[in-house]
Amino acid sequence: KKGKNNTKLHLSTFVLSLAYALVCRVKAEEVKSKRVVLGVSVDYRRWLEPLLPPTYFGNCVGGKAVTVETRELLGEEGVIVVVEALSEALETLNEDGVLNGVENWSSMLFDGLIPDDKIIGAAGSPRFEVYSSDFGWGRPKKVEMVSIDRTATFSLSDSKNGDGVEV
């Protein structure tokens, strides 16, 4: 499928769950800011040029920010607006590479934000399979991301039985 800007839509569990949760949160909090900035963590390993060797053990996580007008989020097609914005952001990773403009990141971060912007983050992924972890005392019965309780961040993970997403 293609979005309004002819962007190929990225219809993953992560994108759809995050879009729905963001719209619900903005409505529930009755956000008054003109814009909402959604910050997402991105695993950069697959986008690096040259590619990392298969023996690489570690991570390479960066961020991607998506800015959406609050009035569009509150509209009838709010979820679609977020899906299109996230899809477009992911497409720029494919087209431009993850390190494009790295020398300007800090100034873009601090100069690009408007004080009135509502900033919300997203952490985790349903692909991490947190309920499959076993450190020797059995699989977890409940997983909670406690480190984000004081920030405006969502946590997404797979559900305990693997057939859904916990937000």
Task: Provide a role label for each language-model segment.
Residues K1-V167:
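Acyl-CoA-dependent O-acyltransferases
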